[in-house]
Curated annotation (Swiss-Prot):
Signal peptide: 1-15
Similarity section: Belongs to the peptidase S8 family.
Highest classification ranks of the organism: Eukaryota, Fungi, Dikarya, Ascomycota, Pezizomycotina
GO CC terms of this entry: extracellular region
Top-level division of the source organism's lineage: Eukaryota
EC number: 3.4.21.-
Residue span, Inhibitor I9 domain: 56-99
Native source organism of the sequence: Corniculantispora psalliotae (Lecanicillium psalliotae)
Regulation affecting activity: Inhibited by phenylmethylsulfonyl fluoride (PMSF).
Its job: Serine protease which can degrade the nematode cuticle.
Protein's name in the database: Alkaline serine protease ver112
Any single biological process term in GO: proteolysis
InterPro entries: PCSK9_ProteinaseK-like, Peptidase_S8/S53_dom, Peptidase_S8/S53_dom_sf, Peptidase_S8_Asp-AS, Peptidase_S8_His-AS, Peptidase_S8_Ser-AS, Peptidase_S8_subtilisin-like, Peptidase_S8_subtilisin-rel
Length: 382
């Protein structure tokens, strides 16, 4: 009897329809300019597909990600796109897009940011800091590049990688951010080592796929560097919401790199901005010298800390200085502060944003919307 039951069921099993494979979601560019025909393909963590297998099947692969993302970027035809969406090893595919720096204005004037983050009250003209000054810590500036020959870096800066058409900083934004982090005159952490990773071109913009490639590079490269007091990544860039960029930022953070990112300059909730909306990184809003939220600064629950961002003077290309504004200028204050605190106290990447919040000066800022922290960065020196 048992054999006859099995025999009766078997034809039904053989006749059952084969389930349609799941189709991987196609994520469109949100709040950013899409790049036609270019995509970021995220593979499942358990994928059997393999990058080498992908290269043999897809001639348009451009960037391969192995650390902060399991996947690659590629130029795809509509046919290749749809074929990949049906591949069981593909988790999602996201349209590549243009992201850009978060600096908005230029004007003459001296910086005040260093004095503000080293005193509880406004009005001081001196920057107070421990002489350890971030020694032994390393900061990667993921930006337009760093002019490492600028004399104010004293030989502690190196431009090491480019995903743009040129390696040098032809814009100035990355050099400015690096100067706020660790230059002799304008820097928060005056003994830190700085590494430039160029992901934005000389107009200040670049593709999402190149930004992720730069982050992937940092996750790998830091393992070969002598950074006994830990590693920081400073990202003064952003655009619309990107799941791929947020995941890359989260994985870079979880790998042991403290990641500071700009909240953005749209005077709106940063929840739809990447990488600012990634909850595990440290998202930075900007203030002016009167302790008012900068008119351009984004806000919202994803913002972790505020720092000086209006009229900040720092290093510039050509061995010069420049005074500009943006959450781009606030972010390197926090990247530099993290390096300073790593050098002074130690600690972990995962705990550093909380440490900066604990140290911060509370409830002195104005024009802070409801639901946004009222925390101004402070280095604890006075």
């Amino acid at each position: 009897m048992r054999l006859s039951i099995i025999a009766a069921v078997l034809p039904l099993a053989l006749a059952a329809p084969v389930a349609e494979p799941e189709i991987a979601p196609l994520i469109e560019a949100r709040g950013a300019q899409p790049i036609a025909g270019k995509y970021i393909v995220k593979l499942k963590d358990e994928a059997k597909f393999g990058i080498m297998n992908a290269k043999s099947k897809i001639p348009g692969i451009e960037r391969v990600y192995e650390n902060v993302l399991n996947g690659f970027s590629a130029t795809l035809s509509n046919e290749e796109l749809e074929r990949l969406r049906r591949d069981p090893d593909v988790e999602s595919i996201e349209q590549d897009a243009i992201f850009s720096i978060n600096a908005i204005t230029q004007q003459q004037g001296a910086t005040w940011g260093l004095t503000r983050i080293s005193h509880r009250a406004r009005g001081s003209t001196a920057y107070a800091y421990d002489t350890s000054a971030g020694a032994g810590a390393c900061v990667y500036v993921i930006d337009t590049g760093v002019e490492d020959t600028h004399p104010d870096f004293e030989g502690r800066a190196k431009q090491i990688k480019s995903y743009a058409s040129t390696a040098r900083d032809g814009h100035g934004h990355g050099t400015h951010c690096a100067g706020t982090i660790g230059s002799k005159t304008w820097g928060v952490a005056k003994k830190v080592s700085i590494f430039g990773v160029k992901v934005l071109d000389d107009s200040g913009s670049g593709s999402l796929s190149n930004i992720v490639a730069g982050m992937d590079f940092v996750a790998s490269d830091r393992q070969s560097r002598n950074c006994p007091r830990r590693t920081v990544a400073s990202m003064s860039l952003g655009g619309g919401y990107s799941a791929a960029l947020n995941q890359a930022a989260a994985r870079l953070q979880s790998s042991g790199v403290f990641v500071a990112v700009a909240a953005g300059n749209d005077n709106r909730d940063a929840a739809n901005t990447s990488p600012a909306s990634e909850p595990t990184v440290c998202t930075v809003g900007a203030t002016d010298s009167n302790d008012v939220r900068s008119t351009f600064s984004n806000y919202g629950r994803v913002v972790d800390i505020f720092a000086p961002g209006t009229s900040i003077t720092s290093t510039w290309i050509g061995g010069r200085t420049n005074t500009i504004s943006g959450t781009s200028m606030a972010t390197p204050h926090i990247a530099g502060l993290a390096a300073y605190l790593f050098g002074l106290e130690g600690g972990s990447a995962g705990a550093m944003c909380g440490r900066i919040q604990t140290l911060s000066t509370k409830n002195v800022l104005t024009s802070i919307p409801s639901g946004t922290v009222n925390y101004l960065a402070f280095n604890g020196a006075t």
